[in-house]
Regions:
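Short, surface-exposed beta-strand/strand-loop-strand elements in extracellular ectodomains
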Residues: 52-63
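Long, charge-enriched amphipathic alpha-helical scaffolds and associated charged IDRs
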Residues: 22-23, 32, 36-37, 52-53
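Short, hydrophobic/amphipathic alpha-helical patches that form generic packing surfaces
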Residues: 39-49
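Structural motif
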Residues: 28-38, 80-81
């Protein structure tokens, strides 16, 4: 279903929770993602902030593809609470980032 591994989303969430100290690392990590992973990441975040429902994942994904004009790092960092939205989005999609986050610590 998702075009990005949960472990990658978990890593982004961890960086997001420490954005003041980890912005450079977050930007570097996001640069390693391919286009499909970036679109999926944005769709997950939108679901987590209630812009789309979990049932509308593919619609959110298509919207992310159409509206991708800002670099993913800039868009995420410019979105307040993006890490919380990513966690919520994964939960709504039936996946938890908690185990993946713990394995990365």
């Amino acid at each position: 279903m998702l075009d990005i591994a949960v472990t990658k989303v978990a890593q982004i969430i961890l960086y997001g929770h420490e954005i003041d100290r980890a912005e450079a690392e977050l930007r570097g990590f996001l640069e390693t993602l391919n286009e499909d992973e970036c679109h999926s990441l944005i769709a997950i975040m939108w679901i987590g902030r209630d812009s789309f429902s979990a049932d509308e994942y593919y619609e959110a994904l298509e919207t992310a593809k159409r509206e991708a004009v800002t670099p993913t790092a800039d868009y995420l960092i410019g979105t307040p609470h993006f890490a919380d939205h990513l966690e919520a989005g994964l939960e709504l999609l039936g996946t938890s980032a908690s185990d993946a986050e713990q394995s990365l610590l």
